[in-house]
Amino acid sequence: MTATEVKAKILSLLDEVAQGEEIEITKHGRTVARLVAATGPHALKGRFSGVAMAAADDDELFTTGVSWNVS
């Protein structure tokens, strides 16, 4: 598929990629990129937000228990 075709059809191509398709993009007859579904740690970024909770609040986690006199 040419870069021009990709530009015109990007939203439908993203749907195809989400279904497992792999799309090769060409420019001047040469393959310059492949459009594939995201995998790995970056693909999951934000997916689990709000699922886990801390057992303590920030004050409990980050206090040293020592009072500091800053004057």
Curated annotation (Swiss-Prot):
Pfam families reported for this sequence: PhdYeFM_antitox (PF02604)
GO aspect biological process, one term: positive regulation of translation
UniProt xrefs under PANTHER family: ANTITOXIN VAPB22, ANTITOXIN VAPB49-RELATED-RELATED
Species: Mycobacterium tuberculosis (strain ATCC 25618 / H37Rv)
Transmembrane intervals: none
Protein known as: Antitoxin VapB22
Family: Belongs to the phD/YefM antitoxin family.
NCBIfam families referenced in this protein's UniProt entry, alphabetically: phd_fam
InterPro entries cross-referenced by the UniProt entry: Antitoxin_Phd/YefM (IPR006442), phD-YefM_TA_antitoxins (IPR051416), YefM-like_sf (IPR036165)
Task performed by this protein: Antitoxin component of a type II toxin-antitoxin (TA) system. Upon expression in M.smegmatis neutralizes the effect of cognate toxin VapC22.
Lineage: Bacteria, Bacillati, Actinomycetota, Actinomycetes, Mycobacteriales
Keywords: Toxin-antitoxin system
